[in-house]
Every structure is written in structure tokens, then in C-alpha cells.
């Protein structure tokens, strides 16, 4: 699930969603950035790179999604990435992985 909005609100909402899933006994993963990585409370938190580093985000996305599969997480939450050059391709891949579920905050 993608969560879009102002960074502090996104972090807070993802942490709420993580707690809800964990209370149900589910393992949860979060795709974060270097800037927000330490602010999450999920079972598996992975930084995709610096928010402004489009190349790193694109390079790490598939690897991170495979890692979550390997870890058998039940739910994945991700920050949204609006980057001008390759951002649309990144967002299209994330939207597909999220089953087009987007939560605006």
C-alpha cells in the first residue's frame, strides 16, 4: 500500500497501519528513504535510498520487493516518491505492487 502526503503525516499513518497489522499477528514491511528509515516500527524496514536520488530508488526497488517476498511479510507499506525524471516509472511499479491501493494523508 502506498501512502502519499507530507512526510511527517506519512510516517505517522504508516506506523498506525503497521501497528494494526502487527496486532493481528501479521509481519509488516516498510519501504522508506534514508531520511525516514529510523522512524518506522515495522518488522522489516528497508531504505530505498535518499529521497532525491532517483537512480538509487530505481536501482533498489525490485531488490527490496524480492526481499520482502523472501521474508514472507504479510503487508508492505511504502512512502510515495514524486521524482521528476524517472519518478513516474517508479510510481507505476509501486502502484502495481500495491494493487493500486493508495492512502492520501
Predicted segment positions?
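Short, flexible loop segments at boundaries between secondary-structure elements
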Residues: 102-105
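A C-terminal functional module that forms or caps the active site or interfaces directly
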Residues: 1-99
Amino acid at each position: 500500500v502506498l501512502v502519499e502526503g507530507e512526510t511527517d503525516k506519512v510516517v505517522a499513518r504508516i506506523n498506525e497501519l503497521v501497528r494494526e497489522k502487527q496486532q493481528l499477528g501479521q509481519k509488516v514491511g516498510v519501504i522508506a528513504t534514508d531520511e525516514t528509515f529510523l522512524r518506522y516500527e515495522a518488522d522489516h524496514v528497508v531504505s530505498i535510498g535518499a529521497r532525491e536520488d532517483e537512480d538509487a530508488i530505481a536501482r533498489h526497488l525490485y531488490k527490496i520487493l524480492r526481499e520482502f517476498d523472501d521474508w514472507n511479510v504479510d503487508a508492505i507499506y511504502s512512502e510515495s516518491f514524486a521524482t521528476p525524471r524517472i519518478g513516474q516509472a517508479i510510481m507505476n511499479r509501486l502502484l502495481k505492487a500495491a494493487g493500486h491501493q493508495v492512502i492520501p494523508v
